[in-house]
C-alpha cells in the first residue's frame, strides 16, 4: 500500500525549485485568482521554517508589511506556487527561526552567508 502512495507522490513532485533554507530571503511568485483572470503576486520575505515531508513539504516566509509582521505558509509542491527565487543567503545556526517573531528593527537582521 505505501509503495503505491510513494509512486503517486513521486509523480506529483516534479516541480524544480532552487535549494533554499531558513534565513534565506526569497521571492515566491503566487498565482492569485481575481474574478475570471489570474495573475502572479510576488511575496518577498525571510524563510523562518522549512518542513520536508515529501509531497506535504512546506515553508514559512515572514516579512514586515507597514510595521506589522506577516507570515505566510506555502506548500512547496502546490500548483498555486509558481516559482521561488532566492534573493540572498542567510547565515543562521537554527533550523527554525521562530525567535524572529519577538524581534523588531535591526535586531531582526540576519547575516549574509559568505561564499
UniProtKB/Swiss-Prot annotation:
Pfam assignment, any one: Ribosomal_L19
Gene Ontology biological-process entries: translation
UniProt KW keywords: Ribonucleoprotein, Ribosomal protein
Gene Ontology MF term list: structural constituent of ribosome
A Gene Ontology cellular-component term: cytosolic large ribosomal subunit
Cited function: This protein is located at the 30S-50S ribosomal subunit interface and may play a role in the structure and function of the aminoacyl-tRNA binding site.
Recorded family membership: Belongs to the bacterial ribosomal protein bL19 family.
Official protein name in the record: Large ribosomal subunit protein bL19
Origin species: Hydrogenovibrio crunogenus (strain DSM 25203 / XCL-2) (Thiomicrospira crunogena)
Lineage per the UniProt record: Bacteria, Pseudomonadati, Pseudomonadota, Gammaproteobacteria, Thiotrichales
Gene name linked to the record: rplS
